[in-house]
Design a protein with these regions (language model features):
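Metal-dependent amide/peptide-bond hydrolase catalytic core
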Residues: 1-106, 110-118
Length: 118
């Protein structure tokens, strides 16, 4: 219906029939990520979501691993340009985002250790 009169000229091909995977949000790692986000921006919050594409997490989750994709990027990054910065020609990250994401993961790792250390 969405393509109207073009329907007869369009071929739809299934590229994958693997269902999406997900990780639970009631874990120490999720809590550590939330704390790291709050440390970077007290007004921010963490919410689960889906993205187009795939990661290696889809192979690890069925084996019992908890896998999250997370990061913090500079508010100066143009979101219209954001997607073109990864996995293509001229792959790059701005220095402010590099600092933010490095500090973020340092906070996640230290926070996770605090949450699970005996």
């Amino acid at each position: 219906q969405a393509i109207g009169d073009l329907a007869d000229d369009v071929t739809i091909e299934m590229l994958s029939d693997q269902p999406s995977t997900r990780s639970p949000t009631d874990t120490p790692m999720w809590d550590a990520i939330g704390r790291a986000v709050q440390a970077a921006d007290p007004d921010a919050s963490v919410h689960p979501g889906l993205i187009v594409g795939g990661t290696d997490g889809r192979f690890y989750r069925p084996k019992g691993a908890v896998v999250y994709g997370a990061g913090i990027f500079s508010p100066t990054v143009d979101m219209a340009d954001f997607g073109s910065r990864f996995h293509g020609n001229n792959e790059r990250i701005d220095l402010d985002s590099l600092r933010l994401v490095t500090d973020f993961w340092d906070h996640v790792i230290r926070g996770f250790d605090d949450l699970v250390a005996p």
